[in-house]
A protein has these predicted regions:
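Short, well-ordered coil/turn elements that cap or connect secondary structure elements
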Residues: 1, 61, 146, 179, ...
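N-terminal pre-domain/capping segments
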Residues: 1-105, 179, 263-275
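Hydrophobic faces of well-ordered beta-strands that scaffold small-molecule active sites
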Residues: 2-8, 40-42, 64-71, 111-113, ...
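Active-site-proximal loop/turn and secondary-structure-junction residues that shape catalytic pockets
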Residues: 10-12, 44-46, 72-73, 117-119, ...
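Gly/Pro-rich active-site loop or hairpin
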Residues: 12-22, 81-88, 124, 163-164, ...
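Active-site acidic/histidine proton-transfer and metal-coordination neighborhood
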Residues: 22-24, 61, 80-183
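Generic structural signal for well-ordered alpha-helices
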Residues: 25-30, 52-56, 97-101, 134-141, ...
Length: 275
């Protein structure tokens, strides 16, 4: 059964980004539980914050699961990327992600590689950069396997990376890895920019998709843009997808309203797909 999740950012430097709740982890968990979400997806400043803020205790208190943990603070706060041409910068990037893979894994959740993948160029050709990316994903995927969870790799739109922009691009990168424990994060906002047919792209990536960001075409809550969710939900059902639809969206018009609109859209979409 497909499950619902909502995002929480704890990174001040990411202010203005597409996260529903901000800063107050306990308040966000409480609101998520009251609205009926199954889980939360957390964007922490570092791995230590998950323990310092007692995320495990909050999940137990509010009867929530942890859908995933983002690693993007490594880029937003420290300008680290896994494909930096300078090895002295690549190693701290990998260590930063490793710490989150471990912290998330202990809580039964995967870590996400999105902005930390970086870009190729600036004196580094695509083959070299792709080697660095594949090497990092392989190592991190094997690390995640020790906790019984996958690593999630997110194709991004062309304005954010030049590695994988479509699910097909992402699948090609997965085929280069020395592990089968890396799955794709299908972000419906990025897909609305890059895919010719989002539903078809999802079906073609059957078996590779491990997580979905539930967002409309304008990065607002589903129902606030022009994405037709019906064929996408049928595609996910056809794939046998039973993971999370996680709202990585702007808090429009405010966090509480965005969360409420998201859970309403989630229920409507899953009900329609089941009929």
């Amino acid at each position: 059964m497909i499950k619902s999740a909502v995002t929480i950012s704890l990174v001040p430097e990411a202010r203005g980004g597409p996260f529903v709740f901000w800063d107050d982890l306990e308040g966000a968990c409480r609101q998520a539980a009251e609205l009926g979400f199954d889980a939360v997806e957390v964007f922490p400043p570092d791995a230590d914050a998950l323990e310092e803020l007692d995320l495990k205790g909050l999940l137990e208190r509010y009867k929530l699961k942890l859908a995933a943990v983002g690693t993007g603070a490594g880029w937003v706060k420290h300008k680290l990327r896994l494909t930096d041409p300078d090895r002295a910068r690549r190693e701290p990037a990998r260590q930063f992600v490793q710490s989150i893979v471990e912290a998330a894994g202990k809580l039964g959740a995967p870590a996400i590689i999105g902005s930390m993948q970086g870009r190729w160029g600036d004196g580094m050709d695509r083959d070299e950069a792709t080697f660095y990316l594949a090497d990092a994903l392989t190592g991190l995927g094997k690390q995640a396997a020790r906790f019984g969870v996958p690593l999630l790799y997110e194709p991004l739109n062309r304005y954010e990376t030049n590695f994988a922009n479509t699910l097909a691009d992402g699948s090609r990168i997965l085929r280069q890895l020395q592990t089968d424990n890396v799955k794709l994060l299908a972000d419906l906002f990025h897909m609305s920019i890059e895919e010719v047919d989002v539903a078809a792209a999802l079906r073609e990536a059957t078996g590779d998709v491990g997580h979905v960001h539930f967002a409309d075409s304008n990065r607002r809550p589903v129902g606030e843009g022009h994405t037709n969710m019906t064929p996408l939900m049928y595609a996910l059902r056809h794939m046998g997808y039973d993971g999370y639809l996680s709202a990585e969206v702007f808090p429009y018009p405010d966090p509480a309203s965005a969360a409420r609109r998201t859970i309403d859209s989630f229920r409507r979409c899953t009900l329609d797909a089941a009929s």
